[in-house]
């Protein structure tokens, strides 16, 4: 069977060099994405089932106990460079009583959406290609079935409409920022800044490609009025690109994209930032202030809403749960 897979993948790559061959494999079999000529199976990408399970288990958990599961978020980078991984939120996770991605989040209806927004910013800034199943971008509450279309009418509710626009802007930003994808499979493309905040459920890391550098700060607890001090190597200022809790996304933070100057220290630029509960932030790192040219933050045109069906709509989104 291994020889069959190797010969099949070699042949497909020769006949269709633009085709992507992706393996769904939950084992630790070595070399799934290694070229056949180097002893591998020759797939282009492999689903990171470990990342998916650890991440969703973490977000299902009560925030009070997330400190004990803190390293469910950090563990994926311990093995990440062994394969060319793809991060999957597939249809398998929205069927057979498993609930949709938004529904998996801990808490009541209003609590689920800020966590889902933070989750997706984490996903999009984690190394690896992304797989998202249709309906995830709507914050859909009903499990998928092949017998009916997506619940487009749910976009009539402000929290879902804001979530849809958030996912649109996140996708646009992902396409615009090379640091989020160009060096996915190079070790120098990712660096932990802080992964020892178990009691506060805070994570900070850097993504880079060539001279482009981005800082990501995640806060996965429900603690209010938090201040976080972080030191970033070779950083003179931070430019906010996206905040999962901006008011335009149904959050609590007014949008502000002004440069944030850091205080020089021996280890780098230091800054103290306020953290909203269940939030994630993405910044561009500027090594100098005078010579840097700030690219404008994402101001994508408003996405067209998908065509809605003519069927009867629900009175409230929450009744769909």
Region locations from a protein language model:
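A structural detector for beta-sheet-dominated domains
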Residues: 155, 231-233, 276
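C-terminal beta-strand-rich structural cap/linker in extracellular carbohydrate-active enzymes
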Residues: 255-295
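Active-site rim elements
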Residues: 102-113, 151-161, 267-272
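Non-heme Fe(II)/2-oxoglutarate
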Residues: 246
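Catalytic cores of secreted or luminal carbohydrate-active enzymes
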Residues: 158-180
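A residue-level signal for conserved active-site and pocket-lining positions in enzyme catalytic cores
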Residues: 170, 238, 278
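Intrinsically disordered, polybasic Lys/Arg-rich low-complexity tracts
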Residues: 291-321
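Conserved alpha/beta catalytic core and glycan-binding cleft of carbohydrate-active enzymes
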Residues: 1-147, 175-178, 185-230, 234-237, ...
């Amino acid at each position: 069977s291994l020889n069959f897979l190797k010969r099949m993948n070699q042949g497909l790559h020769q006949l269709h060099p633009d085709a992507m061959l992706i393996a769904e494999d939950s084992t630790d079999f070595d070399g799934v994405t290694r070229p056949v000529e180097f002893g591998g199976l020759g797939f282009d990408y492999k689903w990171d089932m470990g990342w998916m399970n650890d991440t969703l288990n973490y977000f299902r958990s009560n925030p009070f106990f997330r400190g004990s599961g803190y390293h469910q978020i950090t563990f994926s980078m311990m093995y990440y460079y062994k394969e060319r991984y793809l991060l999957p939120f597939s249809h398998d996770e929205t069927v057979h009583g498993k609930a949709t991605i938004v529904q998996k989040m801990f808490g009541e209806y209003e609590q689920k959406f800020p966590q889902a927004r933070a989750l997706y910013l984490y996903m999009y800034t984690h190394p690896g290609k992304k797989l998202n199943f249709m309906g995830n971008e709507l914050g859909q509450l009903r499990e998928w079935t092949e017998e009916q279309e997506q619940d487009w009418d749910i976009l009539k509710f402000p929290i879902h409409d804001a979530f849809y626009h958030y996912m649109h802007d996140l996708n646009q930003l992902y396409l615009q920022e090379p640091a989020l994808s160009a060096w996915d499979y190079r070790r120098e493309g990712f660096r932990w800044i802080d992964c020892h905040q178990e009691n506060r459920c805070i994570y900070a890391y850097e993504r880079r490609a060539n001279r482009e550098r981005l800082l990501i700060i995640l806060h996965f607890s429900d603690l209010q009025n938090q201040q976080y001090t972080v030191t970033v190597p070779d950083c003179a200022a931070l430019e906010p690109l996206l905040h999962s809790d901006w008011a335009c996304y149904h959050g609590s933070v007014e949008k502000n994209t002004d440069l944030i100057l850091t205080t020089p220290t021996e280890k780098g630029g230091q800054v103290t930032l306020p953290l909203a509960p269940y939030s994630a932030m993405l910044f561009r790192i500027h090594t100098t202030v005078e010579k840097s040219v700030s690219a404008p933050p994402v101001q994508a045109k408003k996405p067209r809403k998908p065509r809605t069906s003519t069927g009867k709509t629900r009175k409230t989104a929450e009744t769909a749960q």
